[in-house]
Amino acid sequence: MAVNPQGVAAVLADLKGRDFLSCADFTAEQTVALLELSRQLKSGDRRIDLGNRVLGLIFTKASTRTRVSFQVAMARLGGQTVDLNPQVTQLGRGEPLEDTARVLSRFCDVMAVRTFAQQELLDYAHWASIPVLNALTDLEHPCQAMADFLTIQEALGSLTGQTLAYVGDGNNVSHSLMLCGALLGVNVRIGCPQGFEPLPEVIDQARNLAVADARIEVMTDPVDAVRGAQALYTDVWASMGQEQEQSQREEAFRGFCLNEDLLAHADPNAIVLHCLPAHRGEEISSGVMEGEASRIFDQAENRLHVQQALLAAVLGGL
């Protein structure tokens, strides 16, 4: 599926004022158009001025790339960012979420929330009268997935029919990769140990969203998962909040390290992705991370360009 570069604004017009809580919130055509707008912003073919709009960040989880990329994205669009750390606001003293969301809607033009429970994000979206963006929850990481597929598109030239193999924990990142990949016509394979699979309801949702006969598969053999794949992806084995499970997970994921041996089973021209931060020597070897196949730091940069496009779309800046 392709969108005429001149037709991007028309396709994205319906996103003005919308929330982005899940990759499934937008249509396949809108997802493709957001990637095209991201490309235009990155290349300098398109410039957008949001006229001093304000983004409010509510992050209850630690963040480097998401926080900085949102701040820089808003600055490059001519806007400002207010960092609403719960530790230094009344949120940390028990102010009800619904009150905070309504008050911030009077001060800000858009809100990005990074938290543990998806329900908390949904509650912000319910009570806020401004667009709410998912900056990560335990269920999904949609901005990351958009940046991932922009990176794959840049490296491979197209998305439809490509195969992305994710090896590791069936976590929030795997959920968003399945949903976004399905909308873009990408075959997504999840390779994980038994008991660490993505949620069945998300797998079913992705399969129902799939276009261009994209296949969503889950398998327990990492070699089968990566065999012939054009893009390989991994993430930490223990996400934030799971640190107490680290030793158990290290044992369970033995054999799932994205190293040179595993990479050898992929397409000879395969690229390697990781959403960072990485634990070298655990889920990915240092050699693969620094090798010729790695597009990991291009991938990190693309968070900026995707989030610029997203902010411009939901704020009607096109």
Curated annotation (Swiss-Prot):
EC assignment: 2.1.3.3
Swiss-Prot/TrEMBL catalytic activity: carbamoyl phosphate + L-ornithine = L-citrulline + phosphate + H(+)
Residues the entry annotates as binding L-ornithine: 172, 235, 239-240
Keywords: Amino-acid biosynthesis, Arginine biosynthesis, Cytoplasm, Transferase
Cellular location(s): Cytoplasm
Keyword Amino-acid biosynthesis in record: yes
InterPro entries the UniProt entry points to: Asp/Orn_carbamoyltranf_P-bd, Asp/Orn_carbamoylTrfase, Asp/Orn_carbamoylTrfase_sf, Asp_carbamoyltransf_Asp/Orn-bd, Orn/put_carbamltrans, OTCase_ArgI
Transmembrane regions: none
Protein residues bound to carbamoyl phosphate: 63-66, 90, 114, 141-144, 275-276, 303
Gene Ontology annotations of biological process type: arginine biosynthetic process via ornithine; citrulline biosynthetic process; L-arginine biosynthetic process
One GO CC annotation: cytoplasm
Source species, domain of life: Bacteria
GO MF term (any one): ornithine carbamoyltransferase activity
Keyword Transferase assigned: yes
Pathway annotation from the record: Amino-acid biosynthesis; L-arginine biosynthesis; L-arginine from L-ornithine and carbamoyl phosphate: step 1/3
Entry function: Reversibly catalyzes the transfer of the carbamoyl group from carbamoyl phosphate (CP) to the N(epsilon) atom of ornithine (ORN) to produce L-citrulline.
NCBIfam families assigned to the protein according to its UniProt record, in alphabetical order: orni_carb_tr (TIGR00658), PRK00779.1 (NF001986)
Family designation: Belongs to the aspartate/ornithine carbamoyltransferase superfamily. OTCase family.
Protein name from the UniProt record: Ornithine carbamoyltransferase
Lineage: Bacteria, Bacillati, Cyanobacteriota, Cyanophyceae, Synechococcales
Gene from which this protein is expressed: argF
